[in-house]
Every structure is written in C-alpha cells, then in structure tokens.
C-alpha cells in the first residue's frame, strides 16, 4: 500500500522521458507561474532521463528546487518506492502512443492527471480515475492540481478506480506478481 507521509503535502510524480512531448516542461512552467500558491502544498518527484540540462536550468532559474525533487534514472526498486510514496501521477503528454508508465501508476492505485492522446483514452476516464486536460493547457493543469489539493477525499476513490481499470490490462500472472510486491 501507499507509504504514509505526515508532511501534509500532496506528492506528485512523473516517471518517463524528460522530453517536451511528455509534457514535463508544461508542468514546470505551470509551477513557475503558480509558485506562490503551490510551493508549500506539493512536492513534485521526477524520475527519468533525457533533457535534464534544460530541466535543471529551468528549475534553478525559477527557484523551484524547494518543491521539486529530481531522482535521476530510477531502477525498479526505486521506482516502486516512488509509486508508493506518490499521491498523484502527473503525465500530461503532448504525444503518446500507449502510456505504459500511466498503466504502471494505475496498478499502484494512483489517480492520474493526463491528456486524452493516443492510448491514454483507454486508460484514464475523466473524473473517474483521474483528470484529463487538453495537451499543453497549463491553466487546466493548474486547476486539476488545485482541485485535488482542495479535495483530497477524491484521491482514494480515483486511485481505487485506477487499480480496477489496471486489472483489465494486466494478465492474471502479472497481477499476482504485483500483489506480492
């Protein structure tokens, strides 16, 4: 189950390629613009490799390091810990084929903030197991995060729905392995 934290903050997670197509720079720009509002309420965990130079420069330039934690490339053990620590998986892709990291997050019963592109529409149902926003729409992204900060009671139900939906995609053998993690 999830690792309980007592810092009263919402832990958001992104795991994937650090690449503008994955929407990660949209997230950072959204956070820079709304820093006053968000910096004491969330922690954003990032795992993955790619254009880390641009990312780190942006984080420094906008002084976001107090609430953004970059974990570098994460192996399976580290990734599992991040999935268990997170409250929400945020993956607002501009382009996506299937969204395997989203499915993985769903198997850990995480609510998802994503975009209705590619195969994601099969995974995330708006207001059921997460919130869908328009690709590149930073205002909607901010509103989705704000909504979940203000209504944390939705997190467990959305997470539960994510887990149920994930089961449809996982063959029973994998599901058993996930149960034993």
Give each language-model segment a name:
Residues 4-22, 28-31, 45:
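Conserved donor-binding/catalytic core segment of Leloir-type glycosyltransferases
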Residues 111-114, 124:
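Short hydrophobic beta-strand element within catalytic cores of glycosyltransferases
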Residues 126-127, 131-138, 147-152:
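Conserved acidic donor-binding segment of nucleotide-sugar-dependent glycosyltransferases
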Residues 94:
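Aromatic "clamp/platform" in nucleotide-sugar-dependent glycosyltransferases that forms part
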Residues 56-74:
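Nucleotide-activated donor-binding/catalytic signature segment of Leloir-type glycosyltransferases, i.e.
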Residues 140, 147, 154-168:
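A short, well-ordered alpha-helix in the C-terminal region of glycosyltransferases
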Residues 15, 43-56, 72:
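Glycosyltransferase donor-sugar binding loop
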Residues 73-74, 81-86:
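Short alpha-helical donor nucleotide-sugar binding micro-motif in glycosyltransferases
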């Amino acid at each position: 189950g999830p690792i309980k934290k007592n810092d009263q903050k919402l832990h958001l997670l992104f795991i994937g390629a650090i690449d503008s197509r994955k929407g990660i720079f949209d997230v950072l720009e959204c956070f820079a613009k709304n820093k006053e509002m968000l910096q004491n309420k969330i922690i954003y965990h990032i795992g993955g490799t790619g254009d880390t130079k641009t990312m780190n420069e942006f984080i420094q330039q906008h002084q976001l390091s107090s609430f953004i934690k970059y974990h570098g490339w994460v192996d399976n053990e580290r990734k599992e810990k991040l999935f268990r620590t997170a409250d929400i998986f945020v993956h607002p892709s501009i382009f996506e084929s299937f969204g395997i990291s989203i499915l993985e997050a769903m198997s850990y019963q995480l609510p998802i903030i994503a975009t209705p592109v590619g195969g994601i529409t099969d995974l995330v149902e708006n207001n059921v197991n997460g919130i869908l926003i328009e690709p590149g729409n930073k205002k909607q992204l901010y509103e989705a995060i704000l909504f979940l900060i203000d209504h944390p009671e939705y997190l467990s139900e959305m997470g539960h729905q994510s887990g149920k939906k994930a089961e449809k995609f996982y063959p029973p053998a994998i599901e058993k392995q996930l149960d034993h993690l």
